[in-house]
Regions:
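C-terminal cap/substrate-recognition subdomain and adjoining C-terminal extension
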Residues: 1, 68, 74-225
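Active-site neighborhood of HAD-like aspartate-dependent phosphohydrolases
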Residues: 1-44
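Helix-loop "lid/cap" segments that line or gate small-molecule binding pockets
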Residues: 25, 49-59
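Glycine-/proline-rich flexible loop or hinge segments
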Residues: 47-52, 69-74
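Conserved catalytic-core helix/loop/strand module for nucleotide-ribose chemistry
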Residues: 60, 64-67
Length: 225
């Protein structure tokens, strides 16, 4: 079955979901919110920033964490422009065509599971967190889902299903999505990342606008870059 793989942050959702969720979490709990901006602007690499982010959830019951994700999503979805409209419309087209839809994201299940349920997604490949025997987050990562890890996970999914990569689609907005985009028959760039736009120009990949809007937004159509 043809499969459409979607990155999430700034490809389907207008927000960076991890940051939006953590800001929502800290605001609701009355906690400090300055550490997140300090982390974002630190010289650490992306993986170390992710690990520092997740360690802030150490000691949180996993069930509470997941339930908070549903509350966060409901709040986010009620905003004026929660989605990347072109990405959402593409997902709806794939769903109408009967394609399998898979989210591939460095974010976590607290954010992604409610998105997947709302949008009729078939599967989620994401950062998986360690949970101890008492059902509490340890703050450690079991499996990251950034860069090459996305391509590795997608390769495993396609091998299991027997789907040829050339029958598949992938959508991404960031240079770290390049390994994923490069492995499918129809890669689709979302937004204006300069690395991805360069590849789009060289290889004739389609480019979608990253305009944010409501679920029923009517922004337009595919362009090529």
């Amino acid at each position: 079955m043809p499969t459409a793989f979607f990155d999430v942050d700034e490809t389907l959702m207008s927000a960076k979901t991890m940051l939006s969720f953590r800001t929502w979490w800290d605001t609701r709990s009355g906690g400090d919110t300055t550490w997140l901006q300090e982390l974002l602007h630190s010289p650490s690499d992306r993986m170390e920033k992710n690990r520092a982010y997740y360690r802030r959830f150490a000691g949180v019951p996993h069930g509470l964490f997941l339930a908070a994700g549903h509350e966060w999503y409901e709040d986010h979805r009620r905003g004026p422009a929660p989605f990347v409209v072109a990405g959402l419309r593409a997902l709806r087209r794939h769903r109408a065509a009967g394609h399998r839809i898979v989210l591939v994201s460095g974010s976590h299940r607290a954010c992604l599971d409610p998105i997947a349920r709302d949008l009729g997604v078939d599967d989620v490949l994401c950062t998986e967190l360690d949970v101890d025997e008492e059902g509490v987050l340890t703050g450690e990562i079991i499996r990251p889902m950034i860069g090459e890890a996305k391509a590795t996970a997608v390769t495993a999914v396609l091998a299991e299903s027997g789907t040829p990569p050339e029958l598949c689609f992938a959508y991404g907005d960031h240079s770290s999505d390049l390994p994923l985009l490069s492995m499918v028959g129809t890669p689709m760039v979302v937004g204006e990342d300069p690395v991805l736009l360069s590849h789009a120009r060289d290889r004739g990949w389609p480019v979608l606008p990253a305009t944010a809007g409501p679920p029923q937004g009517s922004w337009s159509l595919l362009r090529t870059g």
